[in-house]
Swiss-Prot record:
GO terms for molecular function: mRNA binding; rRNA binding; structural constituent of ribosome. Residues 237-270 have a biased composition (Low complexity). The keyword Ribosomal protein applies. This is Small ribosomal subunit protein uS3. Part of the 30S ribosomal subunit. Forms a tight complex with proteins S10 and S14. Pfam families: KH_2 (PF07650), Ribosomal_S3_C (PF00189). It comes from Mycolicibacterium vanbaalenii (strain DSM 7251 / JCM 13017 / BCRC 16820 / KCTC 9966 / NRRL B-24157 / PYR-1) (Mycobacterium vanbaalenii).
Length: 280
């Protein structure tokens, strides 16, 4: 199922984290609906900004929105006018105070969402889909942290009557390995022949020290021990079948049994003042 499922959801809690962080009891459905509306608002108004990810965090009276973008100048606007407009729209939507953080993406060629968006923009500009896919793969593989990439396009490719899917892959993309750091992006290109879906998987190596591996690699001293009952049976060595004791009393008892023949021999031996008797 690693070939079908979303890589982020498949590794959630293992190598990836939640993109919405908050707790709610009775307002759970309302908050989810609000999160979807926030992401839709940012996606529709900022198509050219190159938004890679949106993280939402809630407190009692405040909503924090982190926007990861490759073009922060478009999101901020001249003298911050665009950022103020976005903040006002979000406060009107959530009816709470909104803290807006705009974060720049350093390497957009290694972010799957931005790669998919770039391929989709080329398809909308009537660039051949194979050329766009190969160009995206070449630019991504030049990044030092990228170990493998897979790009897939689905739809009426080249204006064909029947839709199909084609993909190109370079390097390793282990979709079944849970410790693998796989970035996934999806974007739709609007063309004259219809919509073409673009999916991108980028493999950035294995994450050593995830939640499960840290728990499994915990030192033995930190793990809870089971208390042995006081009346345990003595251990037996497998070779001779003798009983092995580890207490001081057991050691003394074993030493006493070994030294017993020597004391008996000393008791039967004649003393120095008594003559020895021999039988003729």
């Amino acid at each position: 199922m690693g070939q079908k499922i979303n890589p982020h959801g498949f590794r959630l809690g293992i190598t990836t984290e939640w993109k919405s962080r908050w707790y709610a009891d009775k307002q759970y459905a309302d908050y989810i609906k609000e999160d979807v509306a926030i992401r839709k608002l940012l996606a529709t108004g900022l198509e050219r900004a190159g938004i890679a990810d949106v993280e939402i965090e809630r407190t009692r009276d405040r909503v924090r929105v982190d926007i990861h973008t490759a073009r922060p100048g478009i999101v901020i606007g001249r003298r911050g006018t665009e950022a103020d407009r976005i903040r006002a729209d979000l406060e009107k939507l959530t009816k709470k105070q909104v803290q807006l953080n705009i974060l720049e993406v350093k390497n957009p060629e290694s972010v799957a969402q931005l790669v998919a968006q770039g391929v989709a923009e080329q398809l909308s500009n009537r660039v051949a889909f194979r050329r766009a896919m190969r160009k995206a793969i070449q630019s991504a593989m030049r990044q030092p942290n990228v170990k493998g990439i897979r790009v897939q396009c689905s739809g009426r490719l080249g204006g064909a009557e029947m839709s199909r899917s084609e993909f190109y892959r370079e390097g390793r993309v282990p979709l079944h390995t849970l410790r693998a750091d796989i970035d996934y992006g999806l974007y739709e290109a609007k063309t004259t022949f219809g919509r073409i879906g673009v999916k991108v998987w980028i493999y950035k190596g294995d994450i050593v020290g995830g939640k499960r591996e840290l728990t499994a690699a915990a030192p033995a001293a930190d793990r809870p021990r089971r208390d042995r009952p006081s009346g345990t049976r003595p251990r037996r060595s497998g070779a001779s079948g003798t009983t092995a004791t580890s207490t001081d009393a057991g050691r003394a008892a074993s030493e006493g049994t070994v030294e017993a023949p020597a004391t008996e021999a000393a008791a039967t031996a004649p003393s120095a003042g008594q003559p020895e008797t021999t039988e003729s």
